[in-house]
A protein has these predicted regions:
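Alpha-helical transmembrane segments of multi-pass small-molecule/ion transporters
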Residues: 1-332
Length: 332
């Protein structure tokens, strides 16, 4: 068991190398890796379950008792970043409204489910992350059409039942199940079961990333100058999303866990839902900016997560000492 857990830690420490390899494999071998697509929701659900084993219902309730961080994350991801995407894309690609539309749509969709995997890996606030992702998805049937209407004058409708069903299967049900097991076993789920499942989740994450990357194969293998410019823009703006989350959290002097959660929930988007909307309501040219995030999102999450973890090592050590001191004081 020690070797198995050690393998999980090794994989977690090298994700910044593993993730680009997974993306490359997905792009180069779409047919072979595409066979994983039918089981991706189940892989998501299992990873959510494993991450939720470290949480309690009391922690989730605290998010709603003090909702400032939740409201702030939703404001940044659903209002601030879409407006910034519209302003910057209009500046660089104003002559092509389809590209502007694709970029705005990319940053109008809900927070990515995969954000929870990275937040769990880098020690973020799990209950806050779950609440942000679920709330972002629940309000998206209102926020997406409203954003597109106000910024672009476009009208779309969202398949609400399908989206809610997916969120329930991938996030809500496995999260509740994980928390229930942790509560009933009085911490055994967090201390024993979660570490035992962690290595398997790392392999599942690789499969999910590679599978999602297959959607970009056609575009990447037939790249032109304009697409390259759009890809560069998406790369820079995607980095900005993570940084904005960190800066907002730092401005409010939030601790490491909450800052990590803000970083990933502001920087990561549910690209698959954006791709569905793009293909249903807009010309084909709109799809490329939306799907382009697939190339960078997971790679950036890995790199930025590791960089932030290193830069805050001293701060986290001080936090651990304060927590340990508090525990010692309570036991005396």
């Amino acid at each position: 068991m020690k070797q198995w857990v050690g393998l999980g830690k090794f994989l977690a420490g090298h994700m910044q190398v593993i993730v680009p390899i997974c993306v490359t494999l997905g792009v180069l071998f779409p047919q072979q890796i595409g066979v994983l697509k039918p089981i991706v929701p189940a892989l998501f659900a299992f990873m959510t379950f494993q991450g939720a084993l470290s949480n309690t219902f009391h922690q989730v309730a605290e998010v709603f008792r003090r909702p400032l961080h939740l409201i702030l994350a939703l404001f940044v991801s659903a209002v601030l970043i879409p407006i910034a995407a519209y302003a910057m894309s209009s500046l660089f690609f104003g002559s092509n409204p389809n590209l502007v539309c694709g970029i705005v749509l990319e940053y109008s969709v809900p927070v990515a489910v995969t954000a929870f995997m990275w937040i769990s890996m880098f020690g973020g606030n799990g209950p806050l992350a779950l609440t942000i992702i679920l709330t972002s998805s629940v309000i998206s049937p209102v926020t997406i059409p409203l954003t597109l209407k106000l910024l672009l004058g476009a009208t779309v409708s969202i398949d609400v039942p399908s989206m809610m069903q997916n969120m329930a299967f991938m996030i809500a049900i496995p999260a509740v199940l994980g928390i229930v097991i942790n509560e009933l076993t009085r911490g055994w789920g967090h201390e024993k079961l979660s570490p035992a499942l962690s290595p398997a989740c790392k392999f599942m994450m690789m499969g999910v990333i590679a599978s999602n990357s297959t959607a970009m194969s056609e575009y990447v293998l037939h790249m032109n100058v304009e697409r390259l410019e759009v890809a560069l823009f998406i790369l820079v703006f995607a980095i900005s999303g993570f940084i904005i989350g960190i800066l907002v959290a730092r401005a409010l002097h939030l601790p490491y866990g909450e800052t990590t959660t803000m970083c990933f929930t502001c920087g990561m988007r549910n690209i698959s839902s954006g791709a569905v909307i793009a293909t249903q309501y807009f010309p084909g040219e709109v799809v490329f900016p939306v799907m382009c995030g697939t190339l960078f999102q997971q790679v950036l999450a890995s790199i930025i997560g590791h960089l932030f973890e290193r830069l805050t090592g001293e701060e986290r050590a001080k936090q651990r000492k304060r927590v340990e001191a508090g525990r010692d004081a309570m036991t005396r």
